[in-house]
Amino acid sequence: MIGLVGKKVGMTRIFTEDGVSIPVTVIEIEANRVTQVKSLENDGYRAVQVTTGAKKANRVTKPEAGHFAKAGVEAGRGLWEFRLPEGQEFTAGQEISVEIFADVKKVDVTGTSKGKGFAGTVKRWNFRTQDATHGNSLSHRVPGSIGQNQTPGKVFKGKKMAGHMGDERVTVQSLDVVRVDAERNLLLVKGAVPGATGGNLIVKPAVKA
């Protein structure tokens, strides 16, 4: 089963009949329009390309306009692709709604995390701070040694250091589907998902469900 592209609306909570509060993220999933179907013969793999939302006419480039027109769909805010499993078929111009998640219990949600700018090792990698006193001068939040000696004489790749934090692709796995509201194009999942309000999200059935 393929996934769908939605938009993060925000967080709220809903109550069960027993009065238990469940924190949920509201994801708006407008109908995903199929812009292209890729086949084994033409492209070397099976996939479906979709768009969603809308884009101002003066923001659509000519190549994009031609691509959307060929599929017979309105220009959307982007293009996303999902690998197509055997036995599932779609046609260009087809619309896929949030109802495909009606029988799904858990989902994986992918988004772009909030950017935190340049962060030190304490914030970025949870390094411990050094002594506040005992002769420590101006080295309370520095990482300490980053290497060994003349051998190997270099800093190894992947060393945890200060640098840009956030604004990267993040996936949260196996979130419970609490409610599917087909009338309002909403999907409610338990817990938090990556990114800021209004950010694009890719929602797929959980691989570990």
Curated annotation (Swiss-Prot):
<keyword id="KW-0689">Ribosomal protein</keyword>
<keyword id="KW-0694">RNA-binding</keyword>
<dbReference type="Pfam" id="PF00297">
    <property type="entry name" value="Ribosomal_L3"/>
</dbReference>
<protein>
    <recommendedName>
        <fullName>Large ribosomal subunit protein uL3</fullName>
    </recommendedName>
</protein>
<dbReference type="GO" id="GO:0003735">
    <property type="term" value="F:structural constituent of ribosome"/>
</dbReference>
<comment type="subunit">
    <text>Part of the 50S ribosomal subunit. Forms a cluster with proteins L14 and L19.</text>
</comment>
<dbReference type="GO" id="GO:0006412">
    <property type="term" value="P:translation"/>
</dbReference>
<dbReference type="GO" id="GO:0022625">
    <property type="term" value="C:cytosolic large ribosomal subunit"/>
</dbReference>
<comment type="function">
    <text>One of the primary rRNA binding proteins, it binds directly near the 3'-end of the 23S rRNA, where it nucleates assembly of the 50S subunit.</text>
</comment>
<feature type="modified residue" description="N5-methylglutamine">
    <location>
        <position position="150"/>
    </location>
</feature>
<comment type="similarity">
    <text>Belongs to the universal ribosomal protein uL3 family.</text>
</comment>
<dbReference type="InterPro" id="IPR009000">
    <property type="entry name" value="Transl_B-barrel_sf"/>
</dbReference>
<feature type="region of interest" description="Disordered">
    <location>
        <begin position="133"/>
        <end position="152"/>
    </location>
</feature>
<keyword id="KW-0488">Methylation</keyword>
<keyword id="KW-0699">rRNA-binding</keyword>
<dbReference type="InterPro" id="IPR019927">
    <property type="entry name" value="Ribosomal_uL3_bac/org-type"/>
</dbReference>
<dbReference type="InterPro" id="IPR000597">
    <property type="entry name" value="Ribosomal_uL3"/>
</dbReference>
<dbReference type="GO" id="GO:0019843">
    <property type="term" value="F:rRNA binding"/>
</dbReference>
<keyword id="KW-0687">Ribonucleoprotein</keyword>
<dbReference type="InterPro" id="IPR019926">
    <property type="entry name" value="Ribosomal_uL3_CS"/>
</dbReference>
